[in-house]
Amino acid sequence: GAEGTLGIITAATLKLFQLPKMISTLFVEADSISNAIKLLNVFKSYFPDRIESFELMPKVFWEVAKNNIEKIILPLEKTPEMGVLIDISSYSKDDASPNEEGEIPIIKKIENVLEECFEKNLISDATICKNENQSKSLWSIREAAAESEKKELEKSNLIKCLKHDISIPVES
């Protein structure tokens, strides 16, 4: 609980992992937390051990972000009810490199999974980042959440400290 600040670490074991050849970032709109959890299960079934992140961002997050982050570019045309930021890793060079048709297999697979999710009405909109700059832009919005909330609270006369980072236990 004290993260090593009150004791001496005498031994440690490290498990090293191969760096991914590619990380695909996508942003989707789910209508509810329930649909977002179903979405996570669909992605886990197609990409076991490859989901690097799955971040839920409700509509209030986007409203606060729009009010407090300069030059914010929303990932979708309208403010999502429940935004989900997903990173999927690819460890295979074949998955991350264009094939004969010029398609990147991991991206094609993500598109197919998204199509299934649309058909199941789990999502209402989605976008896949085309480059690292788009991915960094989305992540910078997510990472600015605490500062955005602080600015919003300073504008109001509400309590002066409000932070949240919600984790949902994932059942195996």
Identify the residue ranges that each predicted region occupies.
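Noncatalytic alpha-helical scaffold of FAD-dependent oxidoreductases
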Residues: 1-172
